[in-house]
UniProtKB/Swiss-Prot annotation:
Family assignment from sequence similarity: Belongs to the glycosyltransferase 2 family.
GO molecular function: glycosyltransferase activity
Residue ranges that the Swiss-Prot or TrEMBL entry lists as coiled coil: none
Species name: Staphylococcus aureus (strain MRSA252)
Record-given protein name: Putative glycosyltransferase TagX
Amino acid sequence: MRLTIIIPTCNNEATIRQLLISIESKEHYRILCIDGGSTDQTIPMIERLQRELKHISLIQLQNASIATCINKGLMEIKMTDPHDSDAFMVINPTSIVLPGKLDRLTAAFKNNDNIDMVIGQRAYNYHGEWKLKSADEFIKDNRIVTLTEQPDLLSMMSFDGKLFSAKFAELQCDVTLANTYNHEILVKAMQKATDIHLVSQMIVGDNDIDTHATSNNEDFKRYITEIMKIRQRVMEMLLLPEQRLLYSDMVDRILFNNSLKYYMNEHPAVTHTTIQLVKDYIMSMQHSDYVSQNMFDIINTVEFNGENWDREIYELWRQTLIQVGINRPTYKRFLIQLKGRKFAHRTKSMLKR
């Protein structure tokens, strides 16, 4: 078979060499490095590796997003002879392919003409040891499924560890989205796939340092607006309630609430802007399926991490919760209860030590 591997890059000098030298396969393959405008040593490093290793091509774009770079790679697949690619992968530039594992995917793909996707497990680097990502724990054995049979696939909104039939090169990432550009393309591919082969082995390891898209107020606003938009779009694409619940759980719990925790740890003072953004998100949840516990977890994040509450901001928060059927006490009683909860939490933490 013939495999095309797309790697979108931009200022990845710390990891790109490790990734490129980790890619090995018995199959005929080519690597397309699509650079979005690196200003560090990423491009010189790729050019040096082109002289050392076969199969590497470099395409340079200017001021291009990750989505634009991936789309350029997909266009290259469509523009070349159909026999040049039977399948493709997109690999994050901060990842590596674990030794001997790439051909686990290619072997599964060749095994059955109905296989349109092969999905392996992803790993993360924990003190130098590769650990299975919790979202991939449902892949317990090698088997063939569909999205209808395995809705847990919707918790894996990442290209890493996935091999696609070349026919899906007609799909595109959303260039208007900075963080969730791949959600729709992945869902469409899963929905269109005749069969999906799951491989219960860790294929790709992620070396990425956790960089949050919510470090300041403007970034946080853009990020929340984006995930509300993609959540609505994808929920409208999913026909089965179980699929919608699994996808919304991933977005509400991991993308929204985890980012909210990080933002409020950095900016604990409760502001009108913060409450309004959380209100907008909570209200958007009411128009689709969601896991009720996630709503309470979001509320707990705001109340427990927030500081410097005043009467006006609390009343906005209280009225928001009343609109979704959740009662809250008066301002003074809330402050007393909150103080007690925080004291109990600190005491419990001290006892654990």
